[in-house]
């Protein structure tokens, strides 16, 4: 079986979403072309599943969950994909950014470790995995002012709501599936009226390391949101 460091034969776009918007798909294809140039291999988009012996380098459209499952494709280390691979669903979302409220329920594998380490760079908030815990967290946060409800599977600010009373939380919770909430979680965070969000990160591919920083900006999509 090829080792993780063996030369890759192709870059494969691994689209795990039910629906990917056309503009995002175009970006993924462009990124796959660039990765293929860096790795010195072809760019292909295969529908049939591959095997470890194919020695592909994968570009997933979202963070992959369950290392054992994706090992069947040959994805075992960072040298096998441009993206993330985590053990539990909540690790793939913003749920890791905040601790639980006291005595809250939590899914398998949960840890507050990252939230505690990053607390100096984050707003005050909580992650919850049940509606009862959401009410408790909201009560605590509302003591200091309005709070923001942040669905963890949404991106670019979509689906977020600001509330200033507990009563305003109830219709939002009513629309949430209890099972999905127990798996993925929900973030409740203090709300800021004027925000400047900085981003930092680092990527590694083909023996190269690239670090970046910048300031986030929001734009309107085709729905005007």
What name fits each language-model region?
Residues 26, 72-73, 162-164:
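Short, glycine/charged-enriched secondary-structure capping and boundary segments
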Residues 198-202:
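Short beta-strand scaffold segments in enzyme catalytic cores
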Residues 96-187, 193, 203-208, 214-225:
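Active-site nucleotide/adenylate-binding loops and adjacent lid/helix of ATP-dependent enzymes
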Residues 18-24, 63-71, 222:
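Short, surface-exposed beta-strand/loop "edge" segments at domain boundaries and coil↔beta transitions
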Residues 2-24, 54-60:
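Short hydrophobic beta-strand segments
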Residues 29, 33-144:
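Conserved N-proximal alpha/beta basic substrate-recognition cap immediately N-terminal to
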Residues 5-6, 50-52, 181-182:
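Short helix-terminating capping/connector loops at secondary-structure junctions
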């Amino acid at each position: 079986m090829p080792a993780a460091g063996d030369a890759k034969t192709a870059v494969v776009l691994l689209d795990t979403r039910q629906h990917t918007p056309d503009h995002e798909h175009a970006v993924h294809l462009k990124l796959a072309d660039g990765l293929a140039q860096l790795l010195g291999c072809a760019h292909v988009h295969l529908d049939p599943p591959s095997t470890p012996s194919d020695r592909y380098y994968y570009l997933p459209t979202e963070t992959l969950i369950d290392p054992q499952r994706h090992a069947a494709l040959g994805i075992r280390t960072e040298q096998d994909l441009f993206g993330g691979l985590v053990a539990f669903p909540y690790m793939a979302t913003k749920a890791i950014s905040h601790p639980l409220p006291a005595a809250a329920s939590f899914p398998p594998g949960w840890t507050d470790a990252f939230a505690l380490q990053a607390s100096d760079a984050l707003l005050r908030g909580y992650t919850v995995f049940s509606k009862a815990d959401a009410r408790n967290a909201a009560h605590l946060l509302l003591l200091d002012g309005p709070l923001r409800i942040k669905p963890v599977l949404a991106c670019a600010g979509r689906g977020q709501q600001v509330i200033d009373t507990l009563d305003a939380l109830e219709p939002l919770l009513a629309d949430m599936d209890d099972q999905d909430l127990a798996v993925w979680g929900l973030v409740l965070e203090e709300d800021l009226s004027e925000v400047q969000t900085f981003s930092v990160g680092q990527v590694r591919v083909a023996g190269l390391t690239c670090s970046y920083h910048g300031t986030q900006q929001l734009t309107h999509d085709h729905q005007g949101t």
